[in-house]
Amino acid sequence: MNDLKSIIGKVATGAPLSREEAASAFDSMMSGEATPSQMGALLMALRVRGETVEEITGAVSVMRAKMLRVDAPAGAVDIVGTGGDGSGSVNVSTCAAFIVAGAGIPVAKHGNRALSSRSGAADVLAALGVKIDLKPDQVGRCVQEAGIGFMFAPAHHPAMKNVGPTRVELATRTIFNLLGPLSNPAGVKHQMVGVFSRQWVEPLAQVLKNLGSKAAWVVHGSDGLDEITLTGPTFVAALEHGQIRTFEVTPEQAGLGLCGSDGLKGGDAAANAVALQSVLDGMPSPYRDVALLNAAAALVVAGRAKTLAEGVAIGRDALDSGAAAARLKHLIAVSNS
């Protein structure tokens, strides 16, 4: 084990940490050995200098080692965003998750309450009637029986309680905003991850590659959204067959029209729940289109679709047949049983 004081001293000089040094430091923080001052110093020094791929990889490896695991099928996917994009948008990845599940791909969705918006994944699911504070075996049963399960981050990452107060006091973004979406308790190997800043698209794809993901898209909308956006291009780093390639996608490539940012504005959890249900009930809207677009990308990652356009067609079938809505009803029933 590396001495935490010496690691903080190294970071203070601007020098990057090795993967092992980062893992040692984050193990100290998450096991409760580090003092609040040490945690604050390390987190802010990393933030100011800029976290490296190796540092994030080391930190995620510790998060994963300490999390409470969920059993999920080998081909399960996660659709998750970092949050913190400040958009106050509708719950895109949550809605997309039901479309993907409706298309027959098991979904092990990881999420939390709102970070910067008025409604995070946990908030909107609770408003829809889903029981979110489940034990790992109960979530596993949801994935098996309903085709989709929700892992409420605080319930699966108990070690985070040791860093929570420091994060609240710092009141600014830290490396932990990046770690959560990369630390899926079901250990999924197929991920669609939205990030709050363009600068993190390629690095997080590299982290996922380092940690054994089979296929992933890391995305950031040109309008700042931590999803694939409907207002213009989206930056993508795709991990495929052990290689990372970067490109841009647009709604038009998937056969969808552009919309203004106002079309994606959300409200509180209750309002967003009504909006999500209306999409699952087949109502046309920009929300339906952006959810279809993100579901299409997840279907590409899962190997179910070859192109975004094909993924949108599969997603439309899942919505129009009622299959996606049925997944929500089933999840509500299983999670509360």
Swiss-Prot record:
Binding positions (anthranilate 2): 167
Residues the entry annotates as binding anthranilate 1: 81, 112
Catalytic activity reported: N-(5-phospho-beta-D-ribosyl)anthranilate + diphosphate = 5-phospho-alpha-D-ribose 1-diphosphate + anthranilate
Top class in the EC scheme: transferase
Cofactor(s) it depends on: Mg(2+)
GO cellular component, one term: cytosol
Binding sites annotated in the UniProt record for Mg(2+) 2: 226-227
Record GO biological process: L-tryptophan biosynthetic process
Record keywords: Amino-acid biosynthesis, Aromatic amino acid biosynthesis, Glycosyltransferase, Magnesium, Metal-binding, Transferase, Tryptophan biosynthesis
Chain sites annotated for binding Mg(2+) 1: 93, 227
Pathway membership, UniProt: Amino-acid biosynthesis; L-tryptophan biosynthesis; L-tryptophan from chorismate: step 2/5
One function term, GO molecular function aspect: magnesium ion binding
Cofactor binding note: Binds 2 magnesium ions per monomer.
Pfam family, one: Glycos_trans_3N
EC number: 2.4.2.18
Binding positions (5-phospho-alpha-D-ribose 1-diphosphate): 81, 84-85, 89, 91-94, 109-117, 121
Family stated for the protein in its record: Belongs to the anthranilate phosphoribosyltransferase family.
Known partners and oligomeric status: Homodimer.
Biological role: Catalyzes the transfer of the phosphoribosyl group of 5-phosphorylribose-1-pyrophosphate (PRPP) to anthranilate to yield N-(5'-phosphoribosyl)-anthranilate (PRA).
Protein name as annotated: Anthranilate phosphoribosyltransferase
UniProt source species: Bradyrhizobium sp. (strain BTAi1 / ATCC BAA-1182)
Record lineage: Bacteria, Pseudomonadati, Pseudomonadota, Alphaproteobacteria, Hyphomicrobiales
Gene: trpD
